[in-house]
Design a protein with these regions (language model features):
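Rieske [2Fe-2S] iron-sulfur-binding domain
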Residues: 55-166, 170-181
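A common structural microfeature
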Residues: 38, 43-48, 61, 70-72
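Generic structural signal for secondary-structure transition and capping sites
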Residues: 42-46, 95, 217
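Short, compositionally biased low-complexity segments
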Residues: 1-18, 180-186
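Low-complexity, highly charged intrinsically disordered N-terminal segments
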Residues: 13-40
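Alpha-helical packing segments of well-folded alpha/beta enzyme cores
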Residues: 33, 45, 69-71, 204, ...
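C-terminal catalytic domain of Rieske-type non-heme iron oxygenases
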Residues: 82, 154-155, 159-371
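Short Pro/Gly-enriched beta-strand edge/turn motifs at strand-loop
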Residues: 44-49, 56-57, 132-137, 310-315
Length: 371
C-alpha cells in the first residue's frame, strides 16, 4: 500500500513514460561509450564548476580540471568585477598557464595578471596578452591575436557554469529549465560556511549518480546507521518518496528525509545530544531570511517533507534540507570505470562554537554516510 500520493497512472515511471523494460548496463562498462560521452556530453553541455563566493574580489580565481573534456579552465573575477572563464592554456606553446606545485592539481588565489611558467608570457584579467619576452625577436607578432581563449560562462543563483561548446546558443537559465526556475530566490548566498570532501572512486560516474537518486537501497543499506525510530520509518516507508519530477534531462526527488531531532534522544550518540546535530544536519534550523519556500521545494507541500534532491544533467546534484542547509554533489569522470566524487556542505555561518561543531559533526557524519 502506498504511503504517499502517486500519479493517476499508478507509478511515477509510467507517469513520465520512462519505459518498463530492462535497462542496458553497457553504457557503464564500455570504454567506447565513455569516449562518446566525453565529446557528446562534457564538451557540449553546461557544467557547474563552483560558486561566486569563491571569487570574492577583482583578481580572485580558481582552476577546474575537466578531465572528461580533456581540458582545464581558469575561472576569475575580471577588472570589471564580472565572472569569466578561459581555457587554462598559454597561447604560446600550449602549456598549462595557472598551476602551483603540480600541474594536475586545482588551485586558487588572487592576482593582477597570469604569467606562464615556461616563457613568461603574461595575460591580464580580461584575458588579453600584455607581455611577450623579447617581443622584438618575433616576426609580425600581434599580441591582440594571442589572448586567452574564452569559455562561455554564466551564473544561476550564485552557481557558476561553463559551456565549452561554441556552437551551443542555449542560455543557461533555459537549459536548467523549470526545476531550476522553481528554486529562484532560495538564499544560497547566505550559506557561506563551506566544507568540502573529495574521493577518487573506482566506478563509472553514472553508477554513483544512480545510487544517489534512488531510495530503494535506504532501508537495507542505511538501516543500522539510523536510530531506532528512524530505522522503523525506513522499513515502513523508506522505499517511497513524496514526489518525483522529470524535466528534460533533469530530475528531482522529494523525500520525507530524516528526523531532526530524533524522537527518542536516548537512542542517539552522546555527542549528537550535546551538539544537536547528526546524520541529517544540525537539528536547530537557522534563520535564512525567507518566510515561505520557493515553489520548487516540497512541491507536494507534505508535512513530512525533509529534503529535495535535484539532479541537473549531466553531473550536478543539489540537496536542500528542511533544516536550512545545502549539500551538493559532483561526479567528474576520469575514465569509463573511475570518477572524482565531490561533496560540498553549505551552512549559514555559525554564531557560536557549539553551532560550528554541530555543522562539523554533520559534515563528517554525512561523509561516512555518503561514502
Amino acid at each position: 500500500m502506498a504511503h504517499f500520493t502517486k500519479p493517476p497512472e499508478g507509478s511515477w515511471t509510467e507517469h513520465y513514460g520512462l519505459g518498463t523494460g530492462p535497462v542496458s548496463y553497457e553504457d557503464s562498462i564500455s570504454p567506447a561509450h565513455y569516449e562518446l560521452e566525453r565529446d557528446a556530453i562534457f564538451r557540449r553541455t553546461w557544467l557547474n564548476v563552483g560558486r561566486v563566493e569563491q571569487l570574492p574580489r577583482v583578481g580572485s580565481y580558481f582552476t577546474k580540471e575537466l578531465d572528461a573534456a580533456r581540458t582545464s579552465v581558469v575561472v576569475l573575477r575580471d577588472s570589471d568585477s564580472a565572472v569569466r572563464a578561459f581555457y587554462n592554456i598559454c597561447r604560446h606553446r600550449g602549456n598549462k598557464l595557472v598551476w602551483n606545485d603540480y600541474p594536475g592539481e586545482e588551485t586558487s588565489g588572487t592576482c593582477r595578471r597570469f604569467t606562464c611558467k615556461y616563457h613568461g608570457w603574461q595575460y591580464n584579467l580580461q584575458g588579453e596578452c600584455t607581455f611577450v619576452q623579447q617581443e622584438s625577436e618575433f616576426f609580425d607578432l600581434d599580441k591582440a591575436y594571442y589572448g586567452l581563449v574564452p569559455v562561455r560562462t554564466d551564473v544561476w543563483e550564485g552557481f557558476i557554469f561553463v559551456n565549452l561548446d561554441t556552437a551551443d546558443t542555449t542560455p543557461l537559465h533555459e537549459y536548467l529549465g523549470d526545476l531550476a526556475a522553481g528554486l529562484v530566490g532560495y538564499p544560497f548566498d547566505r550559506m557561506t560556511q563551506v566544507h568540502r570532501y573529495r574521493a577518487e572512486v573506482r566506478a563509472n560516474w553514472k553508477l554513483f549518480i544512480d545510487a544517489f537518486t534512488e531510495f530503494y537501497h535506504a532501508p537495507v543499506l542505511h538501516a543500522k546507521q539510523a536510530v531506532a525510530d528512524e530505522s522503523r520509518k525506513l522499513q515502513s516507508v523508506g522505499y517511497e518518496a513524496l514526489a518525483y519530477q522529470v524535466d528534460g534531462p533533469h530530475g528531482m526527488v522529494s523525500s520525507w528525509g530524516g528526523m531532526s531531532p530524533p524522537k527518542d534522544l536516548s537512542m542517539v550518540k552522546p555527542i549528537e545530544r550535546v551538539l544537536h546535530s547528526g546524520l541529517f544536519g544540525p537539528w536547530d534550523a537557522p534563520d535564512i531570511g525567507i518566510d515561505e519556500l520557493p515553489p520548487g521545494l516540497n512541491p507536494a507541500r507534505h508535512p513530512s517533507w525533509g529534503l529535495d534532491s535535484f539532479l541537473f544533467f549531466p553531473n550536478f546534484m543539489v540537496l536542500i534540507w528542511k533544516t536550512n542547509w545545502v549539500l551538493t554533489y559532483h561526479y567528474w569522470p576520469t575514465s569509463y570505470n573511475s570518477h572524482i566524487f565531490e561533496g560540498t556542505c553549505y551552512f549559514v555561518p555559525p554564531r557560536t562554537a557549539r553551532e560550528r561543531l554541530a555543522q562539523e559533526l554533520a559534515v563528517v557524519t554525512f561523509k561516512e554516510y555518503g561514502l
